[in-house]
Amino acid sequence: VTTSEPADVEEPVRKKRPRWRRILKRVVITLIILVVILLFGVIPWGLAALVTSAGTRPMDRGLTETPATFGVQFKDIEFQTSDGVRISGWLVPARDKHTTIIYSHGLFRSRRELLERAIDLCRLGYGALLYDSRNHGSSGKARVSLGYNERLDVEAAARYLRDELHSTDKIVAFGISMGATAALLAAAETPDISAVISDSSFLSFDHTVDHHLKLFLHLPVFPIGNELKYFIQSRARFDGAKFDVLDAVKRIGDRPIMFIAAAHDKRMPPEIAEQLYQAGESPKRQLLVVEGPGDNVHGHGYQANPKLYIERLDSFLQTALP
């Protein structure tokens, strides 16, 4: 019997992938990594830096009107918040109404945003304290928080009237947009505020960020919105879970609140004012939805119908603070 050596079996030759495929694979992997970094890091961080560093926009910095422009005497004032921010403002003493209204403006604006409606109410006898919110106008530098830390500015204004000026006037907090949010949050914490006028307030931190992200940038809440909220809270050092305006309205209790919305405002539509109104407990709370030219612009209820706006505010204040 003869045996033969097994024949050598040749292993199949593996073909090397073309070089262009290897390069393409690396490019795709690199692009995926860059997209992940953009979505989870660069875009949210950049937006958070923009929000928390917000100040008065250039077109508002050029404004020079003061109460004196409208023939109303005033004095320049300064006071400090509980977290050490210097706040600059104007004070117009009350005449026969024995009520001083604290005016809080919106993001990127200044005390001049509310000047004309303040003058209208001053002519009816109400006092006015208009101020620049932290990091805006002439006030001191601080990280912006869309209303949560800004509540300390409102509280400081009320404290200035009570403790430094020893005013016996009733104090009303009147804000627009971010300023309305700050006014409601402040009123929930201090009994010195007798009533609130809230024009175009936010609903909560989460809702505000998510809503604006979709409305203006058409970006998804996940992952960008979640990361953006994290970075805003980290930079401005606050807890977004405590930034709940609905809860603040409930805590204000039976103190009167007037909620205002421009009829076709897409940023803070009337439905939000309605939700806040429904959350209130005061039998003296009111809801005003203003129609007229420009009622599709955020916070432009006054501009849409100034006569109706001021008449309703005066009526509310006389009823709320007899």
What is each stretch, according to the model?
Residues 274-322:
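C-terminal catalytic histidine-bearing segment of alpha/beta-hydrolase fold enzymes
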Residues 107-120, 133:
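The serine-hydrolase catalytic nucleophile loop
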Residues 33-80:
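An N-terminal hydrophobic leader/cap segment in hydrolases
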Residues 113, 144-165:
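Alpha/beta-hydrolase active-site loop
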Residues 252-253, 258-261, 265:
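Short beta-strand/loop motif that positions the catalytic acidic residue
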